[in-house]
Amino acid sequence: MVFLLCFFLVADVSYGINGDCELPKVVGPCRGGFRRYYYNSSSKRCEKFIYGGCRGNANNFHTLEECEKVCGVRSRDSPKEN
């Protein structure tokens, strides 16, 4: 049982990006204005956006490095401005 769990975890990391990274960018209805990064599945890059502070989703990272690490982005190109 443990073997199967480990196998599926490794397969998920090896053959696809984190499912949270496929979620759409959500600014949210609040007006906080926090600089965050999200994975854009169309451009296959982590991009900067302004987060309102509430009702976001898991595709919301404090740093570019965190976004790239979680979402498996290999290139270190400058983030796209939105």
From Swiss-Prot:
Q: Where in the cell is it found?
A: Secreted; Nematocyst
The BPTI/Kunitz inhibitor domain extends over: 21-71
Alphabetical list of CDD domains matching this protein: Kunitz_actitoxin-like (cd22633)
Task: Give the source's domain of life in one word.
Answer: Eukaryota
Keyword Disulfide bond carried by entry: yes
Q: Name one GO cellular component term.
A: extracellular region
| Purpose of the protein | Serine protease inhibitor that inhibits both tissue and plasma kallikreins. Has hemolytic activity. Inhibits voltage-gated potassium channels (Kv).
- Classification via PANTHER family: BPTI_KUNITZ INHIBITOR DOMAIN-CONTAINING PROTEIN, KUNITZ-TYPE PROTEASE INHIBITOR-RELATED
Family membership: Belongs to the venom Kunitz-type family. Sea anemone type 2 potassium channel toxin subfamily.
Name of this protein: U-actitoxin-Avd3m
Organism whose genome encodes this protein: Anemonia viridis (Snakelocks anemone)
